[in-house]
Amino acid sequence: MISLGIIGGTGYTGKKLLQFCANHPKIGDVAVYGNNSAGNRLLNLFPELMNTVNDTNILSVENISDEHDIYFVALPHGEALNYIPSLIQKGKKVIDLGGDYRFDDASEYEKWYKIEHSSAKLLNIKKYGLVDYYNIDYSKTELIANPGCYPTSVLLSVLPFIENFSDSINTISTCSYSGTSGAGKSAKTEMLMSEMDGNVKAYNVNNHRHQPEITQELKKAGLQSDYSITTHLLPVAVGIYSTTTIKLNKSINTELVIENYNNKYATSKFVRLRQIPPSLTWVVGTNFCDINVSVKHNTVIITSAIDNLIKGASGQAMQNMNKMFDFDETLGIINNGVTQ
């Protein structure tokens, strides 16, 4: 049994992590560390988890124990920089669910997050944990940068095409739609029900922090053209739906495209290739990423759907943790979807 610490475990992603940990046969002690929530009982914050998790005290982030085997860090950007370097120095395994270690270049992080990166050397040892796509040597991995929610939905659906047909691409862009839980638990006027009910709106147009993260990985796969993503809010709590449009400079073989996707995800436990564009309800409450690829003339339309809190955060983090300890990657992960 392993001991686990969740630093910043009182948000939406922390709640999902707690549920998965409670369902995991290889996880023993779980400690939750918080800032303002320190000193509270866990079930005071999450009464819905009664009979699911132990009602322990939330500990202060100023007194993080060295005794855990692995740490999930689910803090706002910038704050993880205060804790992760010392944990790595002590030989601990860390999975960061925030954005502080996703970039390869510290200057790119500083440009988009407006924060000086105080542990840039760790960017050289971190692994970008897109677990369903990259073949990571987890036996030698200390620090996993868990991908963002939008990047997960886009990269899993688009990377197989980029890797095999990058020289055919003229333009590529994505429209993504997210539930309001992606903004976290802090009170925001624009997230009130009276603001979002029956409403859809774009936000952070040409300025979303996930755009350079996605671009970084697409460029590694061979993308030569520019990339853009336009993010929108949906009047739902959970889920991300992404539609990527690729304009080609030449015709390609549709069967070959589908074959490449089938080959890539043939053994995947959590990526499902669909014959029709997925519905968001197919994946909400699950760790699945559902993908459909349509090729017609010189246009490729790729749609994907994920649960932003699970596949886009805690579920993928649990997959990465399982891989780090050579467990079955499905352990602990709960799939309670509306429909599948």
List the predicted regions and their residue ranges.
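C-terminal substrate-binding/catalytic lobe of Rossmann-fold NAD(P)-dependent oxidoreductases
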Residues: 28-65, 170-171, 176-304
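C-terminal helical cap and adjacent loop that interface with cofactors, partners, or active-site loops
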Residues: 281-340
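Short, surface-exposed acidic/glycine-rich loop or hinge patches that mediate macromolecular interfaces
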Residues: 11, 77-78, 148, 208, ...
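N-terminal Rossmann-like NAD(P) cofactor-binding subdomain of oxidoreductases
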Residues: 2-196, 203-205, 294-296, 339
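Predominant activation on well-ordered alpha-helical scaffold segments within soluble catalytic domains
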Residues: 18, 155-162, 211-215, 258, ...
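Secondary-structure boundary/capping motif
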Residues: 153-154, 253, 312-313
